[in-house]
Structure formats: C-alpha cells, structure tokens
Amino acid sequence: MKATSLRLLARSNILQQVSLTFFTKETCQLCKNAGVILDKTLQAKDFSNVKLKTVDIMKPENSAAFDKYCYDVPVLHVDRPGQKKPVKFMHYFDEEKLAAEFRREV
C-alpha cells in the first residue's frame, strides 16, 4: 500500500472514532447559528462517518444537561477513544476550527 493510502486510511479510522454531542435548545438563536455551521462542517466528504447526537436541554429527560449548560448553549462535545475529557466548543462555532479538531489525532 502506498504511503498516501495508508495516511488516508489512518485519517478515516480517526474520524470514525470521533463522536459529537451538540447541546442546544429550540428557542436559542445562537444554537441555530451554531447548528448551521456544524451541519456545514459535517457535509465535508471526510466527515461522513462522524457520529452526531443532538441533546435538547429543555426536554425533561435531559435535566442533567440543562443543569450543566442552561446558560452556556450552544455547546459541542468532541469525544474520541483515549481522550479523558471531551473537547468543548461553546457559544460561537467556527467551521475551520471545528474541522481542525475533528481531524486532530490524540
């Protein structure tokens, strides 16, 4: 296998292990803006396998998330195996910074 192919395969494996949790609420304009940027970022071909979970902090079953982030949404957790704590993005999202974090190796 060529070195380029090996790098692409390794990057693909890294991206498959990235999981995202997007904490939001329906009445939040910042959340809507962040969601648009997140969706646009995830449309890139190399992010097609990234897992995204959206958590509406206003739903009763998400009360722990509400207690933690009621004044801080939107919040995005970037998790991957071997990482002790998620990387967090809060309030304003930047497409280039998100993409760089999704591609980062731990």
Task: Say what each PLM segment does.
Residues 2-18, 104-106:
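N-terminal leader/targeting and pre-domain segments
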Residues 10-46:
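Local sequence-structure signature of Cys/Sec-based thiol-disulfide redox active-site neighborhoods
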Residues 33-36, 64, 68:
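Generic recognition of short, well-ordered alpha-helical segments
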Residues 38, 48-50, 79, 93:
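Non-catalytic interaction surface on structured domains
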Residues 47-62:
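Thiol-based oxidoreductase modules, predominantly thioredoxin-like and allied folds used
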Residues 67-77:
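Structural micro-motif
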Residues 78-106:
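Non-catalytic, surface beta->alpha helical segment in thiol-disulfide oxidoreductase systems
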